[in-house]
From Swiss-Prot:
The gene is rps16. Belongs to the bacterial ribosomal protein bS16 family. Gene3D superfamilies: 3.30.1320.10. This is Small ribosomal subunit protein bS16c. GO terms for cellular component: chloroplast; mitochondrion; small ribosomal subunit. Keywords: Chloroplast, Plastid, Ribonucleoprotein, Ribosomal protein.
């Protein structure tokens, strides 16, 4: 099953995340199928490609709760 979820990037103490499509069994920092945007909790910056998310949802991917919140509220 495909999941739309966050992948942590950045250094220690300065988190930053990419919104990616991955298989549900893949590790958090594993290989992503597609990048859909990013989220920086320090600067509160969030950019998400909503068109690509709609395409992936129509193909059967599921969003995690955090990505769902970012998709509805922040982007």
């Amino acid at each position: 099953m495909l999941k739309i979820r966050l992948k942590r990037i950045g250094r220690r103490g300065m988190p930053s995340y990419r919104v990616v499509v991955m298989r549900s069994q893949t590790r958090r920092d594993g290989k992503a199928i597609e990048d859909l945007g990013f989220y920086n909790p320090i600067s509160k910056q969030c950019v998400i490609n909503k068109e690509r998310i709609k395409v992936r949802l129509s193909q059967g991917a599921q969003m995690t709760e955090t990505v769902k919140y970012l998709y509805e509220v922040k982007a």
